[in-house]
Amino acid sequence: MTVASQSIEEFKECLYHMQETRKLLTMQLLATGKITSAEIQILKRTLEEMQDERTTDFYIRHIHSRGATFAINIRDEILGLKKDFLFLENFASECESEESFTNRLKLCDLPGLLSNNQIDIRLMNGFAEEVAKCKEFLMDLITIESDGIKPLFITDWDGTMKDYCSQYATNLQPAYSAIVMGVFARNFTRAFAVLTAGPLRHPGILDLTSLPIDGPVMFSGSWGREWWLGGRRVVHDDGIPEEGSVAIGQLYEQLEEILHEGEFVQFALVGSGVQKKVDRLTLGVQTVFGQVPKELSAKYIDAVKERIHRVDPNSQYLILENCSPLEIEVCVHSSGAIWNKGDGVAALVEFNKDSLKLGKVCVAGDTTSDLPMLQKAAQENPTQVRALFVNVNKEIQSTINKIVGDSSRTCFISCPDVAHAAFAQIIIELTQNA
């Protein structure tokens, strides 16, 4: 029996075309507060395509390229589209009768929609309680003290403001998330910055977000080594030798070649895919569901090693690191200290001519790699630092409470949608009569 499949090129083109519409809708809503039903139909068509006969009941979609057929899990893509279409359809309907953006948002009941569409029944049952807790935390954050200074909000992306996705290349932010993030950032913070480990482009956070890249939220990649600020890319390459930067660029071109060979083509969609960062390449070698045959994964890693040897035959500039069973990294030998997200925060503050010592500072994250951001903020502003962390275990919670020094200034939630729902409630409550 022949299994129906879609080409990798068609799959990505379908989703990327839809994402451009999401970006336009978000920009339009942030500017005018209005959309029409006709403008959101591409989301409906994309959702229908993602759920056609090429996708099983368990979100497994069959993809082909150059004679090879493989399966990928598109649960995040489908669930994001479902929630987005429901929200935007309701919002467009309210635009026909309601005059204010706030009333439209209120009548759409985004918190209720998100609660009813959680994949985990445990999240669904406790969703409203978590949203109330998160809202209280955020209301305290944005309450302006006598100094009149709005807070600074610095956040990780994947797992914190955006659900994890099996394919980094199609880890696309829904419009509902972008809209409430954008309005919250614009109205209640002096700066709202995303600091992610992934790259800015090809693909990167600037391609995957639905927010306008020169809008109310700032974006960085490579642990804050590269920022999109003032309409341009600002790079902090301290400690990275020029020869190493050249070598990593050459290796990226080499890997682009082997990903166009039939045998390894699926690795463009496996986990991290191929991410070119300032000082390294991150390569996905296995999915979280173990869908790649072990022999093929090992063969791909060998091919990567062979290309490293071509570019750097004497191992002067590049080093291969096995990060996890899911990905490997090829890093540039650095002559300086190891860069972390705390350094990225310092780079942002310096560029903006801001200070962590001013006002309240909230750091949001979901893993230990986000702790350096919190530590940096706590060192500079120990009495006003706050932490919002997503789906972390008790041990990490304890570490966070120790860094902050006051559990009343920490908040732990189960998923990014809790924060989105809390943003929506605050926008409605504080702008109702504005």
UniProtKB/Swiss-Prot annotation:
Binding positions for Mg(2+) per the UniProt entry: D156, D158, D366
Catalytic residues per the record?
Answer: D158
What the record notes about the co-factor is:
Binds 1 Mg(2+) ion per subunit.
Identify the EC number(s). Answer: 3.1.3.12
Q: Does the keyword Cell membrane apply?
A: no
Among InterPro entries, the record links this protein to: HAD-like_sf, HAD_sf, T6PP_C, T6PP_helical
Q: Which residues bind substrate?
A: Q275, K276, K277
Question: What Pfam families has UniProt attached to this entry?
Answer: T6PP_C (PF21141), T6PP_N (PF18572)
Query: What catalytic reaction does the record list?
Result: alpha,alpha-trehalose 6-phosphate + H2O = alpha,alpha-trehalose + phosphate
Q: Which co-factor is required?
A: Mg(2+)
The keyword Magnesium belongs to this UniProt entry's keyword annotation: yes
Annotated protein name in UniProt: Trehalose-phosphatase
UniProt source species: Caenorhabditis briggsae
Q: What is the lineage of its organism?
A: Eukaryota, Metazoa, Ecdysozoa, Nematoda, Chromadorea
Q: Which gene is annotated as encoding this protein in its UniProt record?
A: gob-1
